[in-house]
Amino acid sequence: MRDAGATFRLNNQVVGFERSPSGDWFVRVKESAGGKTISKTYVAKSLVIASGGFTADRKRCARIDPRLTAEVHTTANPYGTVWDGATSEILDVAQAVGAAVTDGFGLQLLPFWGGRLLDYDGGDIYVNAAGERFVNESLPWKVITDKMLDLEDRSCWVITDARSHKGAMLGLKLINGIVYKADTIEEMASRMHVPSPVLKKTIETYNKSVDKGYDEITGKTIFSQRIEQPPFYFGRESIYIHTTLDGIRTDEHARVLSVQGVPMQGLFVAGEIAGGIFGTDRLGGASMTNCLVMGRRAGKNAAINARKG
């Protein structure tokens, strides 16, 4: 991009933008350099908003889903130990100049950074604090997270065995004490603080369902193996905020729409801050469409607009 003439301005915080009388955009920023903060204003014929979602904005997320209390972290900051800058200041700025914002698509929640080790269905089970399964593990994440939010502690145990094909996070999760190994079901139950007879019955019942190809408890039909080969791998899984599905309203040309539904001249949007692209849920990896396809359209149309007289 530098070879193409692009200029990168680091440590620049956008604090506002508005239309000029001539139709250009005034973009106000605070630039931090050498321990000082300088206010600057840039003028542009075209402006592309690509500031990301607002998963780290606790208040806005809680307004969308009141079940999301302060202890629910994001997938970018799963343990609450690092800074997550996915907040909604630019969304507020866009609304202030008349941009429409979608409402009602919500958030995508994932059980992601805890005990879950598999990237496919059929090789693990989810159990509650009593050691019992409570959900069809092959259902979409939205259904699973809703079931988890109904649990008293809003978390569950994920169990698999030595036969399953685990993801790249296995070693890291073992080292950090997120996932554990046990040679027997009894040892696993003890470390999980659940009744051993209950957990043993849960696994036996599940294995019978694997043999039949149908689980009468949850209706599950996707199985890849029995859970029986030690060592057993288990860990507590929680819910994390992964994606915001609401944001600035746009059209197929990546133009920002006003509250009246009219394209705002010279204003474009791409990425997670664009709302309503996926509806109320999305497939894993589909965000690349929003970033690359809509990003390409936003950039191309912004350039065309900037070249106008």
How would you name each of these model-derived features?
Residues R19, E31, V127-N128, T250, ...:
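Hydrophobic alpha-helical segments, especially N-terminal targeting/anchoring helices
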